[in-house]
Amino acid sequence: MALFLLTCLLAVFSAATAQSSLLGPSSIFGPGEVNVLEGDSVSITCYYPTTSVTRHSRKFWCREEESGRCVTLASTGYTSQEYSGRGKLTDFPDKGEFVVTVDQLTQNDSGSYKCGVGVNGRGLDFGVNVLVSQKPEPDDVVYKQYESYTVTITCPFTYATRQLKKSFYKVEDGELVLIIDSSSKEAKDPRYKGRITLQIQSTTAKEFTVTIKHLQLNDAGQYVCQSGSDPTAEEQNVDLRLLTPGLLYGNLGGSVTFECALDSEDANAVASLRQVRGGNVVIDSQGTIDPAFEGRILFTKAENGHFSVVIAGLRKEDTGNYLCGVQSNGQSGDGPTQLRQLFVNEEIDVSRSPPVLKGFPGGSVTIRCPYNPKRSDSHLQLYLWEGSQTRHLLVDSGEGLVQKDYTGRLALFEEPGNGTFSVVLNQLTAEDEGFYWCVSDDDESLTTSVKLQIVDGEPSPTIDKFTAVQGEPVEITCHFPCKYFSSEKYWCKWNDHGCEDLPTKLSSSGDLVKCNNNLVLTLTLDSVSEDDEGWYWCGAKDGHEFEEVAAVRVELTEPAKVAVEPAKVPVDPAKAAPAPAEEKAKARCPVPRRRQWYPLSRKLRTSCPEPRLLAEEVAVQSAEDPASGSRASVDASSASGQSGSAKVLISTLVPLGLVLAAGAMAVAIARARHRRNVDRVSIGSYRTDISMSDLENSREFGAIDNPSACPDARETALGGKDELATATESTVEIEEPKKAKRSSKEEADLAYSAFLLQSNTIAAEHQDGPKEA
């Protein structure tokens, strides 16, 4: 158990030592001087940085002894016996402050104290001097003034004592101590040397004045104005109280608010905030601004002398005393004033961006801002500073609001976990130069200010031009410089609440993001529709930190309706396309796949020409076999040829005669061969001569390879009458599919079967006589 307690003590000691070395003594701040009357109460506020260590560390209030030891009077969860029932310490970790309250003060409470964090004497503390003055009598004249300021005390006298010596005393331990008199212009007390004067305006005056400059804490107390000498001297008791200035504590880069409440009924009075050091005006109600505070200060005026001043982007040189005042003529010292003491903690810098950002025309900048991530209902905002009393809201995360002028140009992003939000502003122009304020509505201390400058340069990344046609795909290409090679690159679609990342793989919406090693990022939108219209951003980021961004707007265009005529390509006559009639014949009569046999006596009723024959071949066959007139091709222009001139007739008949002569010779040769291979066959009383070679081509005996392709081919004309007109158009030769080879015996059997079938049919017709179809 003892070992466990020792370990805990060592851990506490180590934590205290670590935070002391991390923050330093300057990070704790409180009032340097406290002046209070005997019997009154006092509340002393001490400030500390709001880090994860200090929030949960021990807070203490101790009194210094002559030995240098600091005795704890109150701390977190502890109150000493001396303070029992009249003193306590209250911590406010969210605000980074704790308050020590002490009641029923006595003069014994005067002394030196320390308020701090951690362990006593480890450096994380701040010294406070407390002075408890004797309570004045009811007829005492009370004067109040701030430390380091000047006070003028008026002492009246009567006509009876106008010629007597005038003196000014201080009451110390019940005794009167001479400070100055009218016999000498120098102070009698060395503590006031060079700081005090006594004046009588004229011999007829009924008062004299005592002026004390550069007031110190020990100047507070009771004084006596005396005209004459005892026991007939005229006296007046004076109570001088030093006011404790209002304390303001801020972190480097953060903000503070001066709340000034001065009673003034003059509506035309000039309200101002001045620095005590130098006396220069920081800002006033007439628009005057100290150049050192330009762009980071805002004045808000109320009524009856009440106003507030916000200073953002705190710097270490802002530390010091400030004076709120209301003057009728605009001059200091003319009206009521209030002193404020500002302390800037240099140990912690809350800003996330440098005080000055630079951007290029057409480029982008990212303003990073602090906020408290533990407060989920915070409204994160960005303002444009427009003067001493105006700032213009650009974006609000709580309302999802983006000003119309910044549509597609500005978006706010929260970075989870690290208390930072980023505002990206792109498509920069010279008009964007100025000061921008980051604001978290629930913690004004985190308000920061950034100055934006537009300088010459080229923006990056860049986006290629494109055209988005409704219903068609579009690719948008984004190019990055080499400095972003290791950065994460992305496409997103902008909206009022930010910019939604597009998926890295094909999604249901058809959006595709891909990137190659050449630092080119391509956004592909499939079948662009109205839902795809809007602003798209292409950018790079390192973790949660946004880098440069380029923006482009997708707008739909209607598909172009242009009549395009096909180009005229010269055609080789030898390779000319078939005539329309030939194409129709091809469509009606595809390549035959199987054969079907019909009786030889029936003429086929079909409009399908022989697919294997060209137009020239049809003409030749007609010459070879005049009897087969149904398969001959008739020239459509023969009628007009007969009515032509004799020259045309001769030029036509001569070639025809040559063709007929050649045909007659071919027929003679064919018949000579036919006689050698003719066999006489008798079926009943019917006799005929047939040659086996005549049956080699089954089509000459009425066979159809694929009757299903030509339904009309199944109908025949009886009695030698053809009911269908023979096609007169020239046909294009269609290559027949290769036929399976048969043996001679198979071909003979097949031909003989066809012959028997045809013979039976002819015999039946001969017995029954001809019939009309």
Swiss-Prot record:
- Which InterPro entries does the entry link to? CD300_family_receptors, Ig-like_dom, Ig-like_dom_sf, Ig-like_fold, Ig_sub, Ig_V-set
For this chain, the annotated S-S bridges are 46-115, 155-225, 260-324, 369-438, 478-538
Query: Locations of Basic and acidic residues compositional bias?
Result: 735-746
Residues in Ig-like V-type domain copies: 25-131, 138-232, 233-340, 352-455, 461-557
Q: Where is this region: Disordered?
A: 619-641, 725-746
The residues forming the signal peptide are 1-18
This protein's UniProt keywords: Cell membrane, Disulfide bond, Glycoprotein, Immunoglobulin domain, Membrane, Phosphoprotein, Repeat, Secreted, Signal, Transmembrane, Transmembrane helix
How does the record describe its quaternary structure?
A: Interacts (mainly via CDR1-like domain) with dimeric IgA. Interacts (mainly via CDR2-like domain) with pentameric IgM.
The record's note on its domains: The Ig-like V-type 1/D1 domain contains three complementarity determining region-like loops CDR1-3, which mediate interaction with IgA and IgM.
Q: What is this protein called?
A: Polymeric immunoglobulin receptor
